[in-house]
């Protein structure tokens, strides 16, 4: 049943072409916009407070990525969340580097507190730090395993009423109903900058058409990452093939290759 829901979500994104508002970091804007276009969604990188109320009145979801955070961006992010709340839209939070500095940790928690409808997507160390536990990280890179973050994820689900996506060698999608384990992806994927940020952006696209868990996006990126890696000679060509496979992916391939387990 879950696999059928995931494949139907892929078709729905392509049919509905949802608009996804992104407040994201300078490093990955091009990557994430291209990924959203390739899957069939419509991205807009809107950072201005002056237009945010209007944008959120017709957008499908809001993605907030704190990767290049500063004092100018923080109030814009909070205001954007308020506008998403006013319009009943879901917020997808990527707490990049949470735990690496107090600014990142406090900002991530403030956004999580503000959002009425929330998906949190992070690596294990970010999820652990966001929950207030001691994490092992090196800047924005995780040193903790995905399994180690499961307890923290369950805490965040209860604390913020959120769904939590832990990405890593194994992906976990944790909701109040269940925990789903995904074992797709490829070991080359962490060598392309912004791969997690790409997942966060895709999560926004699928949230806009009704998947408020983050499962469909994680399933899709894991499968296309595997297929792309089979053709790639290294990280550079992996990035190119990843976009191609996001564009080419069909329901049958997704269902056949998906490695999913409900825990």
UniProtKB/Swiss-Prot annotation:
Q: What are the names of the required cofactors? A: Mg(2+)
Which residues are noted in the entry as ATP-binding?
Answer: 121, 167
Can you supply a Gene Ontology BP term from the record? Answer: thiamine diphosphate biosynthetic process
Catalytic activity, EC: 2.7.1.50
Q: Which UniProt keywords apply?
A: ATP-binding, Kinase, Magnesium, Metal-binding, Nucleotide-binding, Thiamine biosynthesis, Transferase
CDD domains associated with the record? THZ_kinase (cd01170)
Q: Which reaction does it catalyse?
A: 5-(2-hydroxyethyl)-4-methylthiazole + ATP = 4-methyl-5-(2-phosphooxyethyl)-thiazole + ADP + H(+)
Residues annotated as binding substrate: 45, 194
Q: Which GO terms describe its molecular function?
A: ATP binding; hydroxyethylthiazole kinase activity; magnesium ion binding
According to UniProt, this protein's pathway is: Cofactor biosynthesis; thiamine diphosphate biosynthesis; 4-methyl-5-(2-phosphoethyl)-thiazole from 5-(2-hydroxyethyl)-4-methylthiazole: step 1/1
Q: What class of enzyme is it?
A: transferase
The family annotation for this protein states: Belongs to the Thz kinase family.
Q: What does this protein do?
A: Catalyzes the phosphorylation of the hydroxyl group of 4-methyl-5-beta-hydroxyethylthiazole (THZ).
NCBIfam families, per this entry?
Answer: PRK09355.1 (NF006830), thiM (TIGR00694)
**Protein name as it appears in the record:** Hydroxyethylthiazole kinase
Q: Which organism is it from?
A: Vibrio parahaemolyticus serotype O3:K6 (strain RIMD 2210633)
């Amino acid at each position: 049943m879950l696999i059928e829901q995931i494949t139907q979500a892929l078709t729905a994104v392509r049919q509905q072409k949802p608009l996804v508002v992104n407040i994201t970091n300078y490093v990955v804007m091009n990557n994430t916009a291209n990924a959203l276009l390739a899957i069939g969604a419509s991205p807009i990188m809107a950072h201005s407070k002056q237009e945010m109320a209007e944008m959120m009145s017709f957008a499908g979801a809001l993605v907030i990525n704190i990767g290049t955070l500063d004092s100018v961006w923080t109030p814009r992010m909070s205001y954007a969340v308020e506008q998403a709340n006013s319009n009943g839209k879901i917020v997808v939070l990527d707490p990049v580097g949470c735990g690496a500095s107090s600014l990142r940790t406090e900002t991530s928690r403030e956004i999580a507190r503000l959002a009425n409808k929330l998906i949190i997507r992070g690596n294990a160390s970010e999820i652990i730090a966001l929950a207030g536990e001691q994490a092992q990280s090196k800047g924005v890179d995780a040193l903790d395993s995905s399994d180690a973050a499961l307890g923290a994820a369950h805490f965040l689900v209860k604390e913020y009423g959120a769904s939590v996506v832990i990405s890593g060698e194994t992906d976990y999608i944790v909701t109040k109903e269940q925990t789903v384990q995904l074992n797709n992806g490829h070991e080359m994927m962490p060598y392309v900058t912004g791969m997690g940020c790409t997942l966060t952006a895709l999560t926004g696209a699928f949230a806009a058409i009704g998947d408020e868990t983050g499962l469909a996006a994680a399933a899709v990126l894991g499968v296309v990452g595997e297929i792309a890696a089979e053709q790639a000679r290294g990280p550079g060509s992996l990035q190119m093939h990843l976009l191609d496979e996001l564009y080419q992916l069909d329901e049958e391939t997704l269902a056949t290759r998906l490695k999913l387990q409900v825990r």
